């Protein structure tokens, strides 16, 4: 069993516990009464003609399968405010509990604190989670190609869009990018971390980014340690980066985001 397979087993078990407490019908009612979703695609650059800087998806993450504990984050709302003040275009909130230490309570706290579009970061394997995300005020959800069939990818994308949310479709290989493009994904992430082994290879981004259509927003995921990595991704075609560890482990995340945005903008200016 791969690391991804093991995570999904736990995700399904935890989801069934929540389903026993809150029915799908109740989630649908809550989703109907939720404030309209914010346009995360526009926040990440939208049409290719207006993408002239690097966007940052700043992540709230207590731990990870590869590194273990990263930060205690007693007040995720306060951290989210710092992210927003630093210029994050989207804030990602982990809600997977077993491996990442996240929760929907974290998400709710962040949602109440900022107007920035929010990514509900979890391993989506059931429509229940999509309704759940919208009911809690999510604007963007994650769909990992490696974890889904083509039918699931299409159906989950369609439901998300029907509910007004955008979708970040995560890939790691050429075949997965082909599947994401076939699903008409508008926001495509390239995760340089292999979720089956947890190995990181930053060169993966450069070898795959050119396969993504220009109209899609390209997000570089994982492997950001500092401005040099940001410049590398931006020079290679990234429109946005998703970064968590480098922010939650830093005492000045607001300034760190500003630094990353400056490095990205400089690289994009050269690229263009």
Curated annotation (Swiss-Prot):
GO molecular function, a single term: phosphoribosylanthranilate isomerase activity
Catalytic activity: 1-(2-carboxyphenylamino)-1-deoxy-D-ribulose 5-phosphate + H(+) = (1S,2R)-1-C-(indol-3-yl)glycerol 3-phosphate + CO2 + H2O
Known pathway: Amino-acid biosynthesis; L-tryptophan biosynthesis; L-tryptophan from chorismate: step 4/5
Keyword Chloroplast: no
GO biological process: L-tryptophan biosynthetic process
Keywords in alphabetical order: Amino-acid biosynthesis, Aromatic amino acid biosynthesis, Decarboxylase, Lyase, Tryptophan biosynthesis
Transmembrane helix recorded as keyword: no
EC annotation from Swiss-Prot or TrEMBL: 4.1.1.48
Lineage top rank: taxon: Bacteria
PANTHER family per record: INDOLE-3-GLYCEROL-PHOSPHATE SYNTHASE, TRYPTOPHAN BIOSYNTHESIS PROTEIN
Family: Belongs to the TrpC family.
Protein name, entry field: Indole-3-glycerol phosphate synthase
Gene: trpC
């Amino acid at each position: 069993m791969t690391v991804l397979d093991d995570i999904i087993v736990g995700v399904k078990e935890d989801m069934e516990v929540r389903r026993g407490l809150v029915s799908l019908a109740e989630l649908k009612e809550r989703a109907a009464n939720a404030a309209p979703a914010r346009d995360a695609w526009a926040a990440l650059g939208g049409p290719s003609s207006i993408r002239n800087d690097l966007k940052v998806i700043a992540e709230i993450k207590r731990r990870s399968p590869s590194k273990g504990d990263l930060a205690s984050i007693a007040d995720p709302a306060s951290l989210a405010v710092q992210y927003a003040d630093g210029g994050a275009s989207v804030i990602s909130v982990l809600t997977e509990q077993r491996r990442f230490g996240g929760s929907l309570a974290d998400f709710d706290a962040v949602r109440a604190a900022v107007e920035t579009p929010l990514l509900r970061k979890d391993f989506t394997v059931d429509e229940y989670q999509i309704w759940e995300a919208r009911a809690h005020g999510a604007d963007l959800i994650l769909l990992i190609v490696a974890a889904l069939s083509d039918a699931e990818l299409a159906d989950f994308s369609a439901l998300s869009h029907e509910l007004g949310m955008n979708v970040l479709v995560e890939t790691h290989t050429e075949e997965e990018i082909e599947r994401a493009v076939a699903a008409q994904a508008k926001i495509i992430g390239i995760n340089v971390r292999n979720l089956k082994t947890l190995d990181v290879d930053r060169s993966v981004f450069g070898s795959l980014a050119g396969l993504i259509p220009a109209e899609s927003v390209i997000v570089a995921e994982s492997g950001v340690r500092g401005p040099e990595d940001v410049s590398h991704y931006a020079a290679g075609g990234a429109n946005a980066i998703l970064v968590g560890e480098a922010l939650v482990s830093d005492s000045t995340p607001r300034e760190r985001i500003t630094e990353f945005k400056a490095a990205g903008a400089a690289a994009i200016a050269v690229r263009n």
